[in-house]
Amino acid sequence: MQASKALLAALALGITGLAQAADEVVVYSSRIDELIKPVFDAYTSKTGVKVKFITDKEAPLMARIKAEGANTPADLLLTVDAGNLWQAEQMGLLQPFKSATIERNIPSQYRSSTDSWTGLSLRARTIVYSTERVKPEELSTYEALADKQWEGRLCLRTAKKVYNQSLTGTLIETHGAQKTEEILQGWVNNLATDVFADDNAVIQAVDAGQCDVGIVNTYYYGRLHKQNPNLRVKLFWPNQADRGVHVNLSGIGLTRHAPHPEAAKALVEWMTGPDAQALFAGINQEFPANPQVAPSAEVASWGSFKADSIPVEVAGKRQAEAIRLMDRAGWN
């Protein structure tokens, strides 16, 4: 009888331990603390589930998950750009997770076709222009920035960044390799300066008069404009008469060996819902991936636009080809 009681007590302790372990989720994130902590704190306040997170660049995080294998503590990988999420999927780091809630909240073009990841927020990679030297009616499409009109007037970020690789991937999907290479060559020919390390530098160069136009992610513009409302730079939405603006995302995927898959899935479902979408997108100065949720007042002030309907995972599928074409065009 005493032995039975001892066994029952041990089992109870074991079950309690499992329940406590399931009351936390571990996220590896390439987004910095200040952009994610308020969201995870809100989830903990609502559910009692603790969200632990580690931040780093996407490549080291993916290498870490791969090295940890079945012993990884990571339940979720949160990163920027569909190209990175697609890469993680190809490396075997993620597993599919079906969810009617996520399917209802997030359009299919912003989710993996294998259900391994979903978008959480959207950013447009669009044109910025000098309000002093360019009239908006002079602008039209990404492709038109290759025209002679813009010779010595264009600024770009390095081709090494996945954001430009993804934009190029969608150009390949739209135009094919030959036409895309011609466009890229035109951009390179029109450069006013060497390429920059980041989008902030592109915007600042346009403001300073080093160049007249550039291509950047919208949230960089949002951050700089917040710091300096007198910025002499504005956004322009290209390709409104055809396919629309190139849109990419921040997204999240369930790791292959997630210790708490159900708890992780519940967190992702909540993050695609109205409250979390407004909070996450607002902090990041991005657009909610859930179309039922309005963007922040600041983001809404940039105006509405037609977005490219190409599934964002195309950016990953075309990534290797995009890098080859960028290299051949001399975009370094």
UniProtKB/Swiss-Prot annotation:
Pfam families: SBP_bac_8 (PF13416)
Annotated S-S bridges: none
Keyword tags: Signal
UniProt xrefs under SUPFAM superfamilies: Periplasmic binding protein-like II
Range of residues in the leader sequence: 1-21
Entries under InterPro entries matching the protein: Ferric-bd, SBP
Classification via Gene3D superfamilies: Periplasmic binding protein-like II
Highest taxon listed in the record's lineage: Bacteria
Family classification: Belongs to the bacterial solute-binding protein 1 family.
Name of this chain's protein: Probable binding protein component of ABC iron transporter PA5217
Organism: Pseudomonas aeruginosa (strain ATCC 15692 / DSM 22644 / CIP 104116 / JCM 14847 / LMG 12228 / 1C / PRS 101 / PAO1)
